[in-house]
Amino acid sequence: MKGSVVFLRSLLCLLCLLPSTLHCEDLEIHVRSESSLLPIAVSLLSSPKDSRQASYLASLRDLFARDLALGDLLAPTKELAPQTIFIEASYPELIFSLKKEGKGSQKIFSLELSGDPSKDHQAIHEAADRIHFLLTRVPGISSGKIIFSLCATNSSTELKQGELWSVDYDGQHLYPLTNEHSLSVTPTWMHISHIPAYMYVSYKLGVPKIFLNTLNQPAGKKILAMQGNQFMPTFSPKTKLLAFISDRDGNPDLFVQSFSLATGAIGTPKKLLNEAFGTQGNPSFSPDGTRLVFVSNKDGTPRIYQMQISPEQHSPRLLTKKYRNSSCPTWSPDGKKIAFCSVIKGVRQICVYDLASGRDEQLTTSTEHKESPSWAADSNHLVYSAGSSNTSELFLLSLITKKSRKIVIGSGEKRFPCWGAFPSQHIKKTS
């Protein structure tokens, strides 16, 4: 067990962060002005039967407005605006309509409340995201789920116990996903439509192995029979390939494995590189599944490389020469950007690389060390963890405003966040 811990700590962006003092302040860089946002009035039309129902409907209206504003493209208001979203409440039904300036109101869709705040909040998140997409053609991001590993702070054991949890972007509806009494890390959504499946690494068998689970199951199942430690899974639904790191042959190497949610692993894992490429880690697929980014220390310090793997494999090439101590690359859903971590002036910061221009940009500046950036569906927002060796919190980061804000959850170390499980935002035409 001790050897597994040493190996895990030698990999990038896992349990060991550089020492730092945690400061949970917002970042103040190039804030987008309100005048560049699209104003949208949100009006609740209701005749509640009592004050409790009135208060509940008003809270849902406010939640809907916050959801619309989350993407940093819309400015919801109770004042007059060129466009208005009407929420007509005929409890338990809510009817959403859109009125544009100089035109009549048109029904968009309706939903039925259950009276369960958790279910109703999710329904409002999904409604807001669908309307956000309708107005901006950019996906809304309030309806996704953030999964992460939660460990007790100041654990005295050498190998901490950490279960997986899910939470909404606003810190609400914190929900336990696993109850395995072990250490679970690096959860990753599989991004398969209508199936909230995710992979993660667990130590419940004594050594780190990759497991598969869904939101409604308390324990996952091991998916690979291969020997050795297994780390950092990532899945491409386009090519049905699983990429991961394993020390089966002695060195932490990058492997790919054909995988189906229905049948499991198909064939045997393929090692992509040899030991001449050093220790490898943190793979991430392009949206089309034909390329990977990953980290290698073959030149002495961890740097990020990009490699085509389909339809034929090409040699890796260095992604950026600007930073020499980088980790945790993750490809944006639109395929245009790669977010990553890099040590800048002694602090691990979040950066982003633009594939079209070849330019990279530092997004954060605060003094706590950051790790594990994960994209929202709009490719404009990230979730990441930040802290020190024994404290860690989750933060949301906007590439539009360049501001971060803490997700207030409670005590414990929150690490390895992954944002996903975004429902379809297609709106069917109504008569």
From Swiss-Prot:
It comes from Chlamydia trachomatis serovar D (strain ATCC VR-885 / DSM 19411 / UW-3/Cx). It is found in: Periplasm. Pfam families: PD40. Belongs to the TolB family. This is Protein TolB homolog. SUPFAM superfamilies: DPP6 N-terminal domain-like. Keywords: Periplasm, Signal. Residues 1-24 form the signal peptide. GO terms for cellular component: periplasmic space. It comes from the Bacteria.
